[in-house]
């Protein structure tokens, strides 16, 4: 081996060791646990190898509810947050003098502690013995009855959850899209204006294709992030998400390991592998679509 290649591998060695210990080994461990039936955590023994853990998880009503919640969050929050971020970024790009100021303001929710933001949302939406919450006060002004967004109907809790998720993830998307818009060559716009091209056509034919790599990057990472949702739900609804009916797949995995029904690493591993397959499948589909629609 040449000295240059050896030197390169030596530079990579710490990262390879780190990834091997904290990523590759846990993944292998999860795969092994998922197929060990009747695993006893205390004695580290199991009764056999098979598909029972997957069968149990896929028939567990708590897991099915978690899958439903996760998919609703993914389907709603990813396109809504990306679309709103694009609109705000276009607006920021058109007001040059105050662009940096507004960009900083919009980015604040992203750097704010998740639990702190969740507490604020609880104050806004939660009904208590002393107040119905700020949002319900606004609803009452319009003559409608108060809604218990935190402990009330499922649709109300899901609305708060999606609203919260969009609020938290949108600042990062605004920052990325604003940077992407700033990198578009102004010569394209000048040439289009000389030809008398309308603003709508400029957006469809120039702006959108030029920033399409960043849009698909945000969509793919948005899907992955939304499927891993858990801490946001805890911030608003507390740790017992099954009672609230707002658990997610990651929350189900955590409960199987450490919750009241915990101590079942085999079930947790099976659920984690199912989540991995779902995320991998959707990511591959997104990448295949991006090859046909992204302009590099």
PLM region spans:
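A structural signal for multi-pass alpha-helical bundles of membrane permease subunits
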Residues: 2-296
């Amino acid at each position: 081996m040449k000295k240059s290649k050896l030197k390169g591998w030596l530079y990579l060695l710490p990262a390879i060791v780190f990834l091997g210990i904290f990523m590759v080994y846990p993944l292998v461990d999860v795969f092994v646990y998922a197929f060990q039936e009747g695993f006893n955590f205390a004695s580290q023994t199991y009764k056999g190898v098979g598909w029972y853990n997957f069968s149990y998880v896929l028939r567990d009503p708590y897991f099915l509810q978690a899958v439903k919640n996760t998919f609703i969050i993914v389907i709603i929050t990813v396109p809504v947050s990306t679309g709103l971020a694009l609109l705000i970024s276009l607006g920021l790009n058109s007001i040059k003098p105050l662009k940096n100021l507004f960009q900083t303001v919009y980015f604040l929710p992203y750097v704010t502690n998740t639990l702190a933001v969740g507490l604020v949302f609880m104050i806004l939406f939660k009904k208590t013995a002393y107040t119905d919450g700020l949002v319900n006060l606004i609803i009452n002004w319009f003559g409608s009855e108060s809604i218990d967004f935190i402990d009330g109907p499922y649709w109300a809790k899901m609305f708060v959850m999606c609203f919260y998720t969009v609020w938290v993830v949108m600042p990062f998307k605004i920052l990325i899209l604003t940077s992407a818009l700033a990198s578009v060559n102004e010569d394209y716009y000048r040439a289009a204006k000389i030809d008398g091209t309308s603003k709508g056509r400029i957006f469809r034919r120039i702006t959108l294709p030029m920033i399409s790599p960043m849009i698909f990057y945000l969509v793919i990472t948005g899907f992955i992030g939304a499927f891993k949702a858990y801490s946001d739900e805890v911030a608003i609804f507390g740790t017992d998400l099954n009672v609230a009916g707002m658990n997610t797949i990651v929350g189900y995995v955590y409960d199987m390991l450490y919750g009241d029904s915990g101590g079942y690493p085999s079930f947790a591993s099976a659920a984690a592998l199912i989540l991995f397959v779902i995320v991998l499948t959707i990511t591959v589909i997104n990448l295949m679509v991006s090859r046909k629609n992204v302009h590099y």
